[in-house]
Amino acid sequence: MDVKSVSARNLGRTSFRHFDFVMAAFVAIILLSNVIGAGKVAQIWLPGVGYWPFGAGILFFPISYIIGDVLTEVYGYARARRVIWAGTVAVLFMAFMSFVVVALPPAPDWKNQAAYEVIFGQVPRIVFASVCAFWAGEFVNSYVIARMKLWTGGKALWTRTIGSTIAGQAVDSLIFYPLAFWGAQGWTNELVIQVLVTQWALKVGWEVLLTPLTYLVVGFLKRAEGVDVFDEGTDFTPFRAEL
């Protein structure tokens, strides 16, 4: 299918073939990263440095940020904004239901309550930090992509994907780790800073390495949808859901 450049303000409520699938994948990855990876610190051996700690949630980053980049690059800021809000609501609902289920009295013969609480008993501080960091980081990422696309005339996609990751992940990490772990038991201030910097650097590195894959996915979706959306005249406030 031929690809035509379209201003976002002329799209209205245009229906896209693959948007729903991209949205569902994005929300699913965000939920998995919060359930499985957010609270664990792993370590990696670096030559000349030794063992260096990093957050296990980094394993989900390659998928989540490719999808995040695709949403804005292919479908425009307004649709990406709706997906970010959907992800935010999904994380809040997951956290609420985790609290409810953990608080339910266990059956007398069920001996796994303590282990269950370790896995799903998220402390309010971590939930608050996670939601704030996700929301702010994703909107910065989307905004930078949309703005840079206008500045570059849609050329040099790699500058947008890498530039938006540098900015968005800086905001995400600077919000999440201090809010979640500064002064927490088992977390020294040095460890918080190490994990924060490592997460940011690894995510930027992932984005650089995966740039060819991002090009393939973006190219496929633009051809499948037949449009290349530019956010001319877009209202970039995050506090609205209209297209």
Language model features with spans:
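Central hydrophobic cores of alpha-helical transmembrane segments in multi-pass inner-membrane proteins
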Residues: 59-70
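Short, highly charged, low-complexity non-transmembrane loops/tails of multi-pass membrane proteins
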Residues: 217-243
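N-terminal membrane topogenic signal
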Residues: 9-25
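Alpha-helical transmembrane segments and their lipid-water interface positions
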Residues: 37, 41, 94-102, 137, ...
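Alpha-helical transmembrane segments of multi-pass membrane proteins
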Residues: 27-43
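Membrane-interface interhelical connector segments
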Residues: 100-125
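Transmembrane alpha-helix/helix-exit interface in multi-pass inner-membrane proteins
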Residues: 91-109, 130, 134-138, 169
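Internal alpha-helical transmembrane segments of multi-pass membrane proteins
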Residues: 151-170
